[in-house]
């Protein structure tokens, strides 16, 4: 017989209070809340299951699914914010705080509406008129007790408005992966000790209910979703309460800093306010589990100044006593509660006076943070500030060798005061330094903070607070906040912080269409235009990959797992920076490749010593350094440390050689002629500039302000510029036979000299050498003559310059920490320096024809071959290529700048993944020429003229072929007269359609007479011409908006009856037209034809400005609107042709071609007119040879009209 043992059920009387208290904490923090209630202008986070369990109104709302599941936002119109605050406090704490009789009435009315029975009965209760607030507590068994709270003073903030602690952002991210994840109550609360239960019991027996928190506790919560790092930096010298630091335990807390510290429970006899004992004590940042009362750990021992801790991030906690006997809860009436310390400003209670004193620091006024006087870095304690200032002071005055030492100048970030730049010391919390930094790291943590979200480490920018997953992404983003913008545009004066930004911007200059659709092979300028195209024409929704989610919170496989576009490589060659005479590094490599013996001496201008920084001479060389601590606005000669020692002899030798080569290359084109190069040696006198162990570079500009730039990998670069520069500082160091040209005069040099300097400063391959050798030979003599002419006047220029020179010094930081001596990349600091409103670097802007074509001859050959072709009217008139030849400058080679080769800042998108698809342009060119030849010979008698064409005869040269016909219309009357006189003996045949008299031999070239129908009906609004009145009437409906034809099925109206008939086929649902490529069916035949262009690639719509083909008419119209906008105000229009130039420089270059053509035509016309006058005077008009002479004269004139 089996005997069953007796068992009894064990019940936790405090479980419900514990769970309700934790839920209330989650509501205050906004954690795991799945619904947002909006009352007036305040947002309240709450749990839908708790609200449904407490209110019938919320139960019906949530069960009826009337709220959108994705947002779960509910708005209550008839309630007040302060009333709903009290209702939420009651729901989550079973406590109602009654402050005045009006509040009772409002709570009773709200309780009736929301279906809360306890609040409905509040109106029947009688409250005294005492000013002290009443706290009505309802226990678990339903017993209601009323007690008058006289211990706390009345909070004035309570009666002023609603509690804004409950206001959270609707789109605020939750810490859980799903907004509707269930609450795991066992993970966090099953380990609550008996001592905590006893404490909660004592708190319930106290006279004040802790859940009834006044508004003043808002300072402790302060949007607890913010990271620990930000809170630690924003509130120095404060102990963050456990409710504001983390509040997450077990699985809810993803941070490694969570600690479960159990405070000592020793009764104390001190007073409640013990601020004097704990006011200056540094407290660690820890977290602990939260129950009914707020509990904080014991503070760490006070650290003395002489004994710093081994790691600033180490926090020592008191060890939990394992042998301490557990306190079993007994009857509430039998146990004597221990001594509890209550806060006088809020409802918090603590076990010891130490914890209370640490908590009282939150209620004290904000103190000024401890800021380093050298780098403006903030610290939380004075001890840490003293240690940091000792290191910062030594590092700012001591030069550091370029090995494993970190950079003194990281990328600059604006400090708290906004007036200076921070130092490389870390701005992250001191507790994270041991984890995130290493001794040999080349990058410091001054630019980011680290925070943990859902267990994932994120790097946050200290300037804009943006978060990044990887540190390299943050480093790349840091250029945006830097004042050094190292990526200039190749076509305008804009400078960008990232190479990706520059690439996106330059697309609008070049007009390249690099994004190609893989379905129809149509190309687009930007990815967004491509995406809209695929959505409209291919029915592809790119949002499917991020919006389709499964019921359990996972993601579906994307519908389009492959990339739906092809990114074509860059076809347009980038323009060079004409401001540089050469690039220092590329020129040095180019000389080594060409094995040219460099000239031995170059004289650097000796600027006035009164305005120069202090120079220290070491081993006969000039050393110039600058301190990184000087702000940008401060000139470097005001207290600048200039002592720098040579630490690396091998590196110095390499840098001396690089400096020697750089100086030679920068002076090779602008000073010495190609035939006679200057040969001298680098002397030991102070004429060469170097920066200690690092090299200097001298870059001469073609702009108005030449500059001398000295850059270093460790220290700040110093840029000296002047309004004019002295080329000859010491005449004793230079022989009078050596011609030296002033850089201030180089800007006036001829284009040939500019071309030679550009070609000589770059290493060339075999193909480029073949192209440029004839050019250099042709320009040697002119450049030699020009340099020789400048040799005599150089002395006068020097004297004037030395009197008016003005030196300004800027401190420019390196482009990136990677631009060290080993990377062979010089900092591009000269690009960003500005003097006044005008930049130093002047870039030469090329013509608007930026597309590079292979096989194009060099510019000098084109100019030589253009003159005889223009002088020969026979070849010019008969050649149809003369009508469509491009007159703009073409670039014969590509130019790569240092910023283009920067490997540390690559674009995100793979710009160079695909090889260019070779397309045969020759066939398209032949078809275009043949088409123009046929259309250009027609007689445009009845066509409307271009408005500006009456004053400009060459308006139609670059227009659409219809414009060519209109252009020929100007010169047709003399041609008609010649034909009539030539065939005056033939009988005249009259055309019945156009009433024009034409001779039988009118088709002299074998072409018949073509009838052009007149259009007598003209629209008064847009001046369009029509053949009949009915067509004009139909056209007028476009202006009046009249739509007389209505669909009987859907009621849609149309202005043309044919459009209505096409529309009615849609309602029939018959799709008779099927695509032969993809078997797709269409209702209309024209829709099928448009669709088939996707497969055939036919581009039947051409721009009338630039002859670019388009697949659709709407795309062509949008493209033409851009031309119109540029013509109206954004571009620079030519007055002799419809050419639109993007810059004034390109317009001037384009107008020079018209000038040469006009002079040539004018000379030819004068000669022919003079010949004609002589013939008319010598012979009578009735002579038989007169017609032959006139025929010889008229033919060249007619051919000239088409040029």
Curated annotation (Swiss-Prot):
Would the keyword Repressor turn up in this protein's UniProt record? yes
**Lineage top rank: taxon:** Eukaryota
Modification after translation (UniProt): Ubiquitinated by RBBP6; leading to its degradation by the proteasome.
Q: Which residue intervals make up region (Disordered)?
A: 230-334, 581-644, 731-776, 857-882, 895-914, 1172-1203
Q: Biological process GO terms, please?
A: DNA damage response; negative regulation of DNA-templated transcription; positive regulation of transcription by RNA polymerase II; regulation of DNA replication; regulation of DNA-templated transcription
* Key words, A-Z: Activator, Chromosome, DNA-binding, Isopeptide bond, Metal-binding, Nucleus, Phosphoprotein, Repeat, Repressor, Transcription, Transcription regulation, Ubl conjugation, Zinc, Zinc-finger
Q: Where is the composition biased (Polar residues)?
A: 269-280, 581-598, 607-628, 635-644, 731-741
Comp. bias regions, Basic and acidic residues: 313-322, 747-757, 866-877
GO cellular component, alphabetical, reads: chromosome; nucleus
Crosslink Glycyl lysine isopeptide (Lys-Gly) (interchain with G-Cter in SUMO2): position given as: 43, 145, 148, 151, 260, 549, 556, 750, 755, 796, 806, 813, 834, 842, 849, 915, 971, 976, 984, 988, 998, 1024, 1033, 1116, 1139, 1142, 1157, 1190
Q: Where is the BTB domain?
A: 33-100
Q: What is its main location?
A: nucleus
Q: Which residues carry this modification: Phosphoserine?
A: 130
The reply on keyword Repeat is: yes
C2H2-type zinc finger positions in the chain?
341-363, 370-394, 459-481, 487-509, 515-538, 1017-1039, 1045-1067, 1073-1095, 1101-1123, 1132-1154
Which tissues does it occur in? Widely expressed throughout the adult brain where it is found mainly in neurons. Also expressed in the adrenal medulla. Not detected in non-neural tissues including heart, spleen, liver and muscle. In the embryo, expressed in the developing brain and spinal cord but not in the migratory neural crest. Also expressed in the limbs, transiently in somites, and in the embryonic liver. In the embryonic neural tube, expression is restricted to late postmitotic neurons.
GO MF annotation terms: DNA-binding transcription factor activity; DNA-binding transcription factor activity, RNA polymerase II-specific; methyl-CpG binding; protein homodimerization activity; RNA polymerase II cis-regulatory region sequence-specific DNA binding; zinc ion binding
Subcellular location(s): the record lists: Nucleus; Chromosome
Q: Where is this region: Interaction with CBFA2T3?
A: 299-522
The record comments on the domains as follows:
The BTB domain is not required for activation of transcription or self-association.
Q: What does this protein do?
A: Transcriptional regulator with bimodal DNA-binding specificity. Binds with a higher affinity to methylated CpG dinucleotides in the consensus sequence 5'-CGCG-3' but can also bind to E-box elements (5'-CACGTG-3'). Can also bind specifically to a single methyl-CpG pair. Represses transcription in a methyl-CpG-dependent manner. Plays an important role in regulating DNA-replication and common fragile sites (CFS) stability in a RBBP6- and MCM10-dependent manner; represses expression of MCM10 which plays an important role in DNA-replication. Acts as a transcriptional activator.
Q: How does it assemble?
A: Interacts with CBFA2T3, ZBTB4 and RBBP6.
Question: What is the official name of this protein in its record?
Answer: Zinc finger and BTB domain-containing protein 38
């Amino acid at each position: 017989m089996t005997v069953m043992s007796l068992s009894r059920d064990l019940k936790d009387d405090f479980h419900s209070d514990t769970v309700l208290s934790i839920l209330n904490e989650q509501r205050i923090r906004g954690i795991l809340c799945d619904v947002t209630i909006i009352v007036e202008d305040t947002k309240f986070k709450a749990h839908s299951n708790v609200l449904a369990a407490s209110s019938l109104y919320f139960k019906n709302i949530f069960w009826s699914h009337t709220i959108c599941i994705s947002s779960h936002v509910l708005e209550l119109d008839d309630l007040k914010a302060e009333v709903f605050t009290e209702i939420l406090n009651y729901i989550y704490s079973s406590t109602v705080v009654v402050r005045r009789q009006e509040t009772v009435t409002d709570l009773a009315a709200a309780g009736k509406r929301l279906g809360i029975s306890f609040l409905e009965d509040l109106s029947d209760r009688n409250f005294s008129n005492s000013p002290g607030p009443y706290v009505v507590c309802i226990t678990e068994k339903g017993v209601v007790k009323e007690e008058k709270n006289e211990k706390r003073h009345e909070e004035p903030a309570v009666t002023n408005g609603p509690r804004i602690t409950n206001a959270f952002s609707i789109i605020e991210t939750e810490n859980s992966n799903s907004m509707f994840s269930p609450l795991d109550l066992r993970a966090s609360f099953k380990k609550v000790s008996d001592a905590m239960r006893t404490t909660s019991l004592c708190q319930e027996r106290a006279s004040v209910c802790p859940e009834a928190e006044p508004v003043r506790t808002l300072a402790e919560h302060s949007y607890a979703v913010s990271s620990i790092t930000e809170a630690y930096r924003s509130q120095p010298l404060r102990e963050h309460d456990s409710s504001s630091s983390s509040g997450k335990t077990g699985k809810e807390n993803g941070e490694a800093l969570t600690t479960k510290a159990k405070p000592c429970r020793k009764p104390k006899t001190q007073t409640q306010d013990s601020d004097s004992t704990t006011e200056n004590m540094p407290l660690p940042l820890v977290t602990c589990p939260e129950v009914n009362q707020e509990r904080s750990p014991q503070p760490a021992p006070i650290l003395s100044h002489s004994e710093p801790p081994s790691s600033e991030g180490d926090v020592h906690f008191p060890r939990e006593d394992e042998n301490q006997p557990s306190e079993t809860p007994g009857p509430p009436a039998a146990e004597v509660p221990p001594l509890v310390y209550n806060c006088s400003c809020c409802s918090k209670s603590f076990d010891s006076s130490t914890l209370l004193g640490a908590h009282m620091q939150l209620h004290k006024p904000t103190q000024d943070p401890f800021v380093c006087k050298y780098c403006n870095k903030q610290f939380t304690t004075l001890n840490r500030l003293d240690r940091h200032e000792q290191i910062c002071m030594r590092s700012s005055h001591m030069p550091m060798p370029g090995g494993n030492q970190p950079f003194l100048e990281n990328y600059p970030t604006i400090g708290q005061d906004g007036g200076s730049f921070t130092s490389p010391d870390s701005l992250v919390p001191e507790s994270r330094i041991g984890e995130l930094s290493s001794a040999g790291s080349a990058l410091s943590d001054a630019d980011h903070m680290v925070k943990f979200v859902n267990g994932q480490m994120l790097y946050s920018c200290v300037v804009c607070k943006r978060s990044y997953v990887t540190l390299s992404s943050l480093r790349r983003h840091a250029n945006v906040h830097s004042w050094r913008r190292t990526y200039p545009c190749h076509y305008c004066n804009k400078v960008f912080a990232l190479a990706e930004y520059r690439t996106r911007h330059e697309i609008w200059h070049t007009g390249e269409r690099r994004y190609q659709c893989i379905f129809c092979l149509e190309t687009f300028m930007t990815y967004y235009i491509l995406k809209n195209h695929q959505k409209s024409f291919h029915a592809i929704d790119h949002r499917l990959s991020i919006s389709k989610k499964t019921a359990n919170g996972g993601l579906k496989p994307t519908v389009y797992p492959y990339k739906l576009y092809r990114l074509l490589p860059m076809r347009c060659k980038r323009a060079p920076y004409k401001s540089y005479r050469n690039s220092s590094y590329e020129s040095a490599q180019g000389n080594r490749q060409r094995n040219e013996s460099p000239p031995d001496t170059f004289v650097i201008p000796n600027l006035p010593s009164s305005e120069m920084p202090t120079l220290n001479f070491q081993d006969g060389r000039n050393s110039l350094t600058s301190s990184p601590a000087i702000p940008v606005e401060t000139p470097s000669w005001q207290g600048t440390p200039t002592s720098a020692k040579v630490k690396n002899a091998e590196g110095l030798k390499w840098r001396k050689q690089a400096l020697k080569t750089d100086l030679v290359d920068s002076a090779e084109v602008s000073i010495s002629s190609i035939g006679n190069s200057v040969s001298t040696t680098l002397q030991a006198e102070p004429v060469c500039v170097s920066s200690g162990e690092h090299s200097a570079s001298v870059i001469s500009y073609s702009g108005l302000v030449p500059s001398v730039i000295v850059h270093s990998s460790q220290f700040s670069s110093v840029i000296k510029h002047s309004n004019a520069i002295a080329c000859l500082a010491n005449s004793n160091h230079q022989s009078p036979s050596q011609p030296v040209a002033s850089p201030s005069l180089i800007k006036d040099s001829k284009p040939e000299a500019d071309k030679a300097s550009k070609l000589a400063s770059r290493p060339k391959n075999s193909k480029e050498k073949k192209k440029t050798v004839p050019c250099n030979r042709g320009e040697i003599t002119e450049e030699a003559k020009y340099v020789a002419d400048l040799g005599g006047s150089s002395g006068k220029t020097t004297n004037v310059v030395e009197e008016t020179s003005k030196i300004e010094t800027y401190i420019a930081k390196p482009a990136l920490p990677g631009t060290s001596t080993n990377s062979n990349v010089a900092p591009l600091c000269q690009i960003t320096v500005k003097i006044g409103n005008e930049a130093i670097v002047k870039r030469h802007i090329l013509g608007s024809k930026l597309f590079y074509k292979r096989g194009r001859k060099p510019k000098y050959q084109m100019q030589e071959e253009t003159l005889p072709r223009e002088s020969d009217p026979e070849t010019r008139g008969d050649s149809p290529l003369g009508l469509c030849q491009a007159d703009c400058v073409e670039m014969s080679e590509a130019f790569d700048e240092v910023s283009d080769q920067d490997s540390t800042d690559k674009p995100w998108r793979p710009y160079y993944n695909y090889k260019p698809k070779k397309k045969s342009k020759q066939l398209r060119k032949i078809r275009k020429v043949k088409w123009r030849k046929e259309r250009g010979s027609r007689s445009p008698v009845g066509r409307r003229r271009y408005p500006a064409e009456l004053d400009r005869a060459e308006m139609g040269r670059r227009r659409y072929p219809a414009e060519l016909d209109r252009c020929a219309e100007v010169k047709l009357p003399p041609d008609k007269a010649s034909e009539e006189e030539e065939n005056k003996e033939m009988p005249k045949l009259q055309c019945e359609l156009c009433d024009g008299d034409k001779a039988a031999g009118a088709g002299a070239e074998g072409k018949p007479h073509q009838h052009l129908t007149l259009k007598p009906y003209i629209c008064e609004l847009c001046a369009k011409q029509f053949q009949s009145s009915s067509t004009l009437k139909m056209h007028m409906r476009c202006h009046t908006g009249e739509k007389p034809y209505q669909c009987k099925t859907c009621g849609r109206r149309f202005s043309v009856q044919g459009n209505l008939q096409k529309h009615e086929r849609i309602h029939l649902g018959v799709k008779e037209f099927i695509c032969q490529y993809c078997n797709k069916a269409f209702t209309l035949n024209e829709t099928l034809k448009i669709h088939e262009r996707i497969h055939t690639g036919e581009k039947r719509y051409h721009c009338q400005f630039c002859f670019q083909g388009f697949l659709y008419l709407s795309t062509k119209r949008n493209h033409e609107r851009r031309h119109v906008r540029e013509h109206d105000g954004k571009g620079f229009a030519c007055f002799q042709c419809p050419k639109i130039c993007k810059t004034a420089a390109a317009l001037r270059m384009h107008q020079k071609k018209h000038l040469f053509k006009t002079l040539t035509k004018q000379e030819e016309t004068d000669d022919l007119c003079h010949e004609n006058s002589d013939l008319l005077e010598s012979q009578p008009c009735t002579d038989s040879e007169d017609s032959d002479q006139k025929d010889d004269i008229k033919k060249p004139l007619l051919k000239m009209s088409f040029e």
